[in-house]
């Protein structure tokens, strides 16, 4: 059984608990609860935009899913685990076209670097590879601190930044 919560349909926590308890009573040993980004309870949906923003600002957990899990565990007495698949859920096994596109992006990026062109994202537009300024796609450039742990760790793994 899978319970899903999506922003378009505010959930009723009492109903979620009833569903889980019913499954436990009928012998089910687990219930999967899938919570989408932006999921909202009926109580929160009834708040004004200002009240809801204030509530979100006061939240101590990084996501509503942790609040839901905590409440399920408190009300059912059952262990509750959270798994956030993030971008991996959009993935899957790459096919030939994915590999070709990745190669095209890599080649175009490398050629741009050789020409001294930086601050661009490679994109496919109208069937052709093109350079898009990062300011246009990301709002602003985000710089990596060369002294950061991430850079140090990458170098320890043998990744070159062309500076040594």
Predicted features and spans:
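Conserved active-site and cofactor/substrate-binding residues in soluble primary-metabolism enzymes
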Residues: 11-18, 27, 59-67, 75, ...
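Phosphate-binding loop/pocket of nucleotide- and phosphate-handling active sites
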Residues: 67, 122-164
């Amino acid at each position: 059984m899978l319970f899903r919560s999506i922003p378009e349909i505010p959930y009723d926590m009492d109903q979620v608990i009833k569903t889980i308890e019913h499954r436990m009573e009928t012998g089910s040993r687990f219930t999967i609860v899938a919570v989408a980004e932006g999921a909202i309870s009926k109580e929160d949906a009834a708040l004004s935009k200002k009240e809801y923003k204030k509530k979100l600002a006061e939240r101590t957990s990084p996501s509503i899913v942790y609040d839901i899990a905590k409440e399920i565990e408190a009300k059912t007495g059952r262990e509750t685990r959270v798994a956030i698949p993030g971008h991996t859920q959009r993935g899957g096994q790459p096919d030939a076209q994915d590999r070709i596109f990745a190669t095209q992006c890599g080649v175009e990026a490398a050629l741009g670097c050789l020409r001294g062109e930086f601050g661009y994202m490679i994109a496919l537009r109208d069937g052709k590879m093109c350079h898009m300024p990062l300011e246009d796609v990301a709002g602003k450039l985000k710089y990596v601190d060369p002294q950061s742990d991430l850079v140090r760790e990458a170098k320890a793994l043998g990744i070159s930044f062309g500076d040594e």
